């Protein structure tokens, strides 16, 4: 565990490797060894582009968004909004992150990050941390707050860590040809 107690990790964000880090700890790990510590953003390309991103994070989407008005919804999403697992996910990560290096996985709030860590663990990666509050952080749960329901608690963006909208082509997702 890089910086906080495992008991504080939401059940949906837990992984088979049991390696967790909060955004501040993840940033410190990357600063200490940027050649061997990789930040992997597994959000969709659209989230990465339009929601902002950590400008040194490699984007490899775990899922691709799909809409089918007759289909099921992903948890917490409107009816018909679902996702299809990226069939090239593990191979794409293998192309950008050596399996002997440390990988810090980020999604929006930690759930997809946990799924990504588990897939990478199954593929033989051993030092993969889930950034448990992700890029956006948890929702404010206070009906009296103007921020009720908004992702304004914790997370990379809310911790005041560096992020932006600039693009670095070598870090962005490219579909295999």
Protein language model regions, located:
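Rhodanese-like catalytic fold shared by cysteine-dependent sulfurtransferases
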Residues: 1-37, 45-102, 113-177
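Short, surface-exposed ligand- or partner-binding patches at beta-edge/loop junctions that are enriched
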Residues: 105-106
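Conserved G/P- and acidic residue-centered "switch" motifs that form tight phosphate/ATP-binding loops
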Residues: 110
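N-terminal glycine-rich beta->alpha transition that marks the start or flank
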Residues: 41
């Amino acid at each position: 565990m890089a910086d906080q107690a495992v008991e504080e990790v939401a059940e949906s964000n837990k992984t088979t490797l049991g390696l967790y880090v909060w955004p501040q700890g993840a940033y410190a790990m990357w600063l200490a060894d940027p050649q061997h510590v990789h930040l992997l953003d597994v959000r969709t390309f659209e989230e990465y582009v339009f929601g902002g991103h950590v400008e040194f994070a490699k984007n490899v989407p775990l899922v691709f968004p799909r809409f089918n008005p007759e289909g099921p919804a992903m948890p917490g999403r409107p009816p018909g909004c679902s996702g299809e697992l990226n069939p090239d996910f593990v191979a794409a990560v293998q192309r950008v992150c050596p399996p002997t290096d440390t990988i810090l996985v980020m999604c929006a709030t930690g759930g997809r990050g946990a799924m990504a860590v588990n897939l990478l663990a199954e593929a033989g990666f051993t030092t993969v941390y889930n950034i448990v509050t992700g890029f956006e952080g948890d929702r404010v749960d206070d009906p009296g707050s103007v921020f009720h329901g908004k992702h304004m608690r914790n997370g990379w963006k809310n911790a005041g860590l560096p992020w932006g909208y600039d693009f670095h082509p070598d870090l962005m997702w490219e579909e295999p040809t």
